[in-house]
Amino acid sequence: MLKTLKDKKLENCSSINNKSKKQQKIIVGLSGGVDSSLSAALLIEDGWKVEGLTLWLMKGEGSCCSEGLVDAAGLCEDLGINHNILDSRVIFEREVVKKTTEGYESGFTPLPCSMCNKNVKFEEMLNFVIKQKEFTYIATGHYARVQKVSCENIKNYENFQFKDFLLLRGADRNKDQSYFLYSLSQEVLSRLILPLGNLKKEETRKEALRLGLRTAKKPESQDLCLVEHYGSMQKFIDNHIEPKEGEIKHINGEILGTHNGIQHFTIGQRKGLGIAWPEPLYVESLDKQKNIVYVANKKDLFKREAIIKEINWVSIEAPLKEIEVEAQIRYRSEPVKGILVPVKNEDNLTKKFKLIFEDNQSSITPGQAAVFYKDEILLGGGLICEFSKI
């Protein structure tokens, strides 16, 4: 075991049963990158019986997935472990490509990574483990942490009814990826090991170099797999959605120009509008029904409330009354204080929540995730479906 990690400890130790690690098999999701590679190597050093699993997601040769498959296979050969490949192209096409396309067509700005984590990656890994029966746990290279609930880690949160396992931010806030994991189930968390949860990115590189991993110097991917495959999100959109001309209107009602499809715009966008105005204008909202792009001054982008749907309560039971949270409405944004209020439908059931911010927020974007935290604990998250006009 690496001395540098002895003090930090591998994550999820509290959820591991007393059975010797050498008797337990773990499947590690391998993308071909340095993070997942190091996760596998660290688990091997820690005494686990490790096998790799790579999901084949994208159709076509020369894609990011085919390169990742080659790198992952080579890594497994270097480490002396089995490499499993799972053909997930059909489910990825249905759950990510199709739903991303539908989102853009509806005037939303989808979050493909969350779709993939929710309906493809972790579900496929979990199903693989359950089907194979020989594996006990799954692991990935995400910068986040999982802890089993104890009196110690929830003693300051009396207002919440916690589930058995907590999802927490990664120790490196600059690399924390918990935002993308808000859709995970307790079943997944109960089996999930995150070896990098307590590490900083620079430590990851150093350890990968020290261990001589072939991926140690591999550049970090900054793009979605859809972007890497198609070249840009614009090319993905052009490949899947037909252009449809519509109007660009100022929120005061004045027609300023035309566009070739609302799928090309997102809330807060300034560049590429192709209109003239005395001062900078930004996309304020998108009207799918009328095919109109509304623009406004920057001050008009600030809103106080948003409606959140399809909420997954990761670490707590669904609250029955309003709660105070720290909400993160995009991956790189800082969490902001707000109140979540249950919204009941005509059947008196709570299907949505209203998120009321302490301070007005700019460019609240339907289709993106709103993720709720209490300090380091990720409580839950859902999709922004609308925002207030105030």
From Swiss-Prot:
Its EC number is 2.8.1.13. It is an enzyme of class 2 (transferase). GO terms for molecular function: ATP binding; tRNA binding; tRNA-uridine 2-sulfurtransferase activity. The active site is at residues 116, 225. One of its GO terms (cellular component) is cytoplasm. It catalyses: S-sulfanyl-L-cysteinyl-[protein] + uridine(34) in tRNA + AH2 + ATP = 2-thiouridine(34) in tRNA + L-cysteinyl-[protein] + A + AMP + diphosphate + H(+). ATP binds at residues 29-36, 55, 141. Disulfide bonds join 116-225. The record marks 142, 368 as: Interaction with tRNA. Its main location: cytoplasm. Keywords: ATP-binding, Cytoplasm, Disulfide bond, Nucleotide-binding, RNA-binding, Transferase, tRNA processing, tRNA-binding. InterPro entries: MnmA-like, MnmA-like_C, MnmA-like_central, MnmA-like_central_sf, Rossmann-like_a/b/a_fold. Belongs to the MnmA/TRMU family. HAMAP family: tRNA_thiouridyl_MnmA. Catalyzes the 2-thiolation of uridine at the wobble position (U34) of tRNA, leading to the formation of s(2)U34. This is tRNA-specific 2-thiouridylase MnmA. It comes from Prochlorococcus marinus subsp. pastoris (strain CCMP1986 / NIES-2087 / MED4).
